[in-house]
A protein has these predicted regions:
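Catalytic-core helical/loop segments in enzymes performing group transfer/polymerization on anionic/lipid-linked
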Residues: 1-565
Length: 565
């Protein structure tokens, strides 16, 4: 590929910095090898600092690209090296923090290049800014602690202590997960309890990770639990003041364990790593994870018997906390990690590493949705047990039947939670000529409100867009093309015979959740409207998937085998 620079030969390596399409594609190509380097690097970082136990709750070690900028920085440093190796005439490289400034400057000297490194600051004192951010994080932790500790006391509602051995079901939840009748909507394992035999179903207790933004959130959820027929272990009802103090002080102490920093690209990147570690001091992520760890100690002290733990496994720090908590206080209990979703390889942490397994932060077995994912999940840890399990969240998908002779005149925009990516999708569609014979329908991510979205992306108020709230399966019969990014919706669309476009990212790498799972004849990565038009013109709108995409149905037998893992 011939690499080209635009914008007066400047290379913008900031978050959100716009790249030429050629460089954006080169960055995506490079990123596949950087994933391997990144995984190896975190192992060396952990070894250099002798990390053990709760040290693994620091986000720097997690390989989650949505929690730290390390992976993104590594990719962009390799992109810069590629530009230098291809003798591109760089005048300016723009960065946004001191760590990248030092690393880029070191690469410049290493290659004998001559360009200006521009450090785009927001003005003001960097020290004061870091201090104010630290105070803000402390204030957030105090606020969360007060809500979580005080509200259960004020409600004066006793927690329910199981009187028999239980199956612990880990999941995320919010107040809106109770319907108008008071029934709990299981968005993680739908159909599991209904499919199990009565004796097994009665042993299942939901242990939700709550999204608490206001005092009423916790109050309403606890009241909802009381009305529900399901059984719940609400962590906030079990913790005491010492647990919050423990989490508070450990959230200050643990990130400071990172002191020795290996080189990357042959240059010193200690400022990048230490800055990311500093951002984790008093962070809500590490605080919540430490509370989850202590939760298992409280359960053990109350003599709660756990037969099995099912972890909604994204290999985030909260998942690590669950694994460490179980292995510390319930060492004989088996942990089943359930990945009831399909994401791209950009989400590096979803593939466990050998050093995470040795540290005890991964489940005993990890369940995936498709046979093609088994080898992917074993890439960095061949000894990790990976199996295909029932696709609980995709039951409606497996029951879907195409509507014959339907008028497919909709381009469905299934927008992700990330606003920047959603904005790119909207902007691409606005570049399609106005005499277009298709309608653009916007389906927002469940956590994003229309009001908030229009504030962030005012372009979406254009009359060519219509917001819809119907389910994907109700929309698919009339959909000619789905436009999205790294989402399970892409897989669902292909399964239902709808072609897919993955928006090409010009500010970072582009990854498709369909790569290696679905034939590329049904999807493409697009950076411009011409690609969208070509996909519409060349794709058969009545195609059927091949057998290797089949999901495991939810049956009594498959549910029983899942619980027995």
């Amino acid at each position: 590929m011939v690499l080209k620079l635009r914008m007066e030969n400047s290379l913008d390596l900031r978050s959100g910095g716009l790249l030429s399409i050629e460089l954006a594609k080169e960055l995506t190509k490079i990123t596949h090898s950087v994933r391997d380097e990144y995984t190896d690097y975190i192992g060396r970082l952990a070894q250099s600092n002798s990390l053990t136990g709760l040290d693994w709750l620091v986000n720097v070690t997690c390989r989650n690209p949505y929690q730290t900028k390390i992976f993104d920085n590594f990719c962009k440093l390799r992109l810069l090296e590629s530009c230098l190796d291809n003798n591109l005439q760089l005048n300016t490289v723009i960065v946004e923090d001191e760590g990248m400034y030092e690393a880029v400057d070191a690469l410049c000297r290493k290659h004998g290049a001559n360009f200006t490194v521009e450090f785009a600051t927001t003005g003001g004192s960097a020290v004061l800014s870091r201090f104010m951010h630290l105070l803000r994080r402390v204030a957030i932790l105090v606020y969360i602690s007060l809500i979580s500790f005080v509200i259960p006391i004020l409600l004066k509602k006793k927690k329910i202590i199981p009187d028999h051995s239980i199956i612990y079901l880990d999941m995320f939840a919010k107040v809106s997960d109770f319907d108008e009748n008071g029934d709990f909507i299981d968005r993680h394992y739908p159909g599991l309890l209904q499919t199990l035999e009565r004796g097994q179903a009665d042993k299942a207790w939901y242990a939700p990770i709550l999204s608490i933004r206001a005092p009423d959130d916790l109050k309403l959820f606890i009241n909802g639990v009381e009305r529900s027929n399901n059984r719940f272990l609400i962590m906030e009802q079990w913790l005491n003041a010492s647990d919050y103090l423990f989490a508070f002080f450990q959230s200050f102490k643990l990130p400071r364990r990172i002191k020795k920093v290996p080189d990357y690209c042959g240059v010193d990147i200690s400022t990048i790593i230490l800055r990311e570690s500093a951002l984790d001091i008093f962070s809500a992520g590490i605080f919540d994870s430490l509370l989850r760890y202590r939760f298992f100690q409280r359960l053990k002290k109350s003599r709660v018997k756990i037969d099995k733990v099912i972890d909604w496994s994204e290999n985030q720090v909260v998942d690590r906390a669950l694994c460490l908590g179980v292995r510390s206080f319930y060492p004989s209990v088996r942990i089943i990690g359930y990945q009831g979703f399909i994401v791209s390889e950009y989400y590096v942490s979803h593939e466990p590493s050998w050093y995470e397994r040795e540290a005890g932060t991964t489940p005993d077995v990890i369940c995936v949705m498709n046979e093609a994912l088994v080898s992917r999940k074993k890439k960095y840890c061949p000894d990790q047990k990976i199996v295909v399990a029932p696709a609980f969240r995709f039951m409606n998908l497996m029951n879907y039947h195409s509507v014959v002779d339907s008028v497919r005149d909709i381009i469905l925009l299934a927008l992700p939670v990330h606003i920047d990516t959603s904005r790119m999708i909207i902007q691409l569609c606005l570049r399609v000529h106005e005499d277009f014979n298709y309608k653009f329908h916007i389906k927002l991510h469940p956590t994003v409100t229309k009001k908030k979205f229009l504030v962030e992306v005012p372009e979406a108020s254009d009359s060519r867009f219509k917001f819809v709230e119907d389910s994907l399966y109700d929309l698919f019969p009339d959909t000619a093309l789905l436009v999205s990014s790294d989402s399970s919706a892409c897989f669902e669309a292909i399964y239902c015979g709808v072609a897919v476009i993955i928006i090409g990212n010009r500010t970072g790498p582009t990854f498709s959740p369909l790569d290696g799972i679905v034939s590329s004849e049904y999807w493409d990565v697009c950076y411009d409207p011409d690609c969208l038009m070509k996909m519409l013109a060349t794709t058969d709108q009545s195609f059927k998937i091949n057998r290797d995409m089949q999901l495991m149905p939810v049956t009594k037998e498959s549910a029983k085998e899942f619980i027995a893992l």
